[in-house]
A protein has these predicted regions:
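Hydrophobic helical membrane-anchoring modules
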Residues: 2-11, 15-23, 203-256
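Glycine-rich, basic loop-to-helix element that forms the pyrophosphate-binding segment
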Residues: 86-102
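Acidic donor-binding loop at a coil-to-helix junction in glycosyltransferase catalytic cores
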Residues: 192-198
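Short beta-strand/loop segment that forms part of the nucleotide-sugar
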Residues: 31, 44-45, 53-65, 85-87
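Short aromatic/hydrophobic "clamp" motif used to bind/position activated sugar donors
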Residues: 107
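Short, well-formed alpha-helical segments that are part of the catalytic scaffolds
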Residues: 35-50
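Conserved donor NDP-sugar-binding/catalytic core segment of glycosyltransferases
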Residues: 119-148
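The conserved acidic donor/metal-binding loop of glycosyltransferases
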Residues: 111-115
Length: 256
């Protein structure tokens, strides 16, 4: 696999890539990978089953060790669609980097610890054929690697995303390139909640958010390692702290 170096305004990228024609009607899958995160291996195992459906797969990582990735390229029938990119730490920056490099007309931002199903892929495929202007998200389910109390968090995520129209990044946000560019990308100057702030920006621009009638699963390991109550309260507090000024700004723009 060939290697090249590309330079952006903010950093240098090291990518493992082969040039390949891409069907722009397909999806570019963008997966940010954090330091010492190996959960993407299990995700790629699932993605390999649906690889024909993607224009390309971008793993945007802060690690320079691509040994495991090189092994994965041999498990894809077309190794040219999967790419490994090294960039600086920061989830918002990683997501924007993937979007800049992607060539598909649809951008699907997926967490490395997400788990997919055939039903989820099929439901998203159907939805994308009917509406090109919305941001799509899935229902959320937690894996069994955490406390059983995370079932309450699933319920809370459903209410937040369906009633308040505030889905988070672990619900697999997918949108057209035009919509992403209209939003201006993910904010990079925040310590957390870049996905949350992007959704608020969508509300300000009256961009619809639509639920996919399917579920993706995410890891509950943080609820186990940090404690269910502590983690839940921390998420609620951070969400409220970010939401209040955004809500005030949204109401202000509506009243002008």
């Amino acid at each position: 696999m060939a290697t090249y170096h590309a330079t952006t305004d903010s950093d240098k990228l090291c990518c493992h890539k082969k040039a390949a024609p891409v069907n722009s009607a397909k999806i570019s899958l963008i997966i940010p990978v954090g330091p010492d995160d190996s959960s993407w291996n299990s995700l790629l195992e699932q993605i390999a089953l649906f690889q024909a459906w993607f224009a390309e797969i971008w793993l945007i990582t802060t690690s320079t060790d691509s040994a495991d990735f090189e092994c994965w390229t041999r498990r894809f029938s077309d190794s040219e669609i999967i790419h490994w990119v090294h960039t600086i730490i920061g989830r918002g920056h990683q997501l924007n980097t993937g979007a800049r490099l992607a060539t598909g007309s649809w951008l699907w931002f997926l967490h490395a610890d997400s788990r997919l199903s055939h039903d989820a892929i099929s439901a998203l495929s159907t939805a994308l054929q009917s509406d090109h202007d919305s941001i799509y998200f899935f229902n959320l389910k937690f894996e069994t690697d955490g406390p059983t109390a995370t079932r309450l968090n699933e319920w809370g995520a459903w209410m937040r995303s369906h009633w308040l129209r505030l889905p988070f990044g672990d619900q697999g946000l997918c949108m057209s390139r035009e919509t992403f560019e209209r939003l201006g990308g993910f904010p990079e100057n925040v310590p957390y909640g870049e996905d949350h702030l992007l959704v608020w920006q969508a509300h300000k621009q009256r961009i619809p958010l639509r639920a996919i009638p399917a579920t993706i699963t995410t890891s509950a390991r943080k609820y186990r390692s940090d404690g269910w109550f502590r983690t839940t309260i921390r998420h609620l507090w951070r969400t409220a702290a970010q939401s209040l000024p955004q809500l005030v700004a949204l109401l202000g723009s509506r009243l002008r």
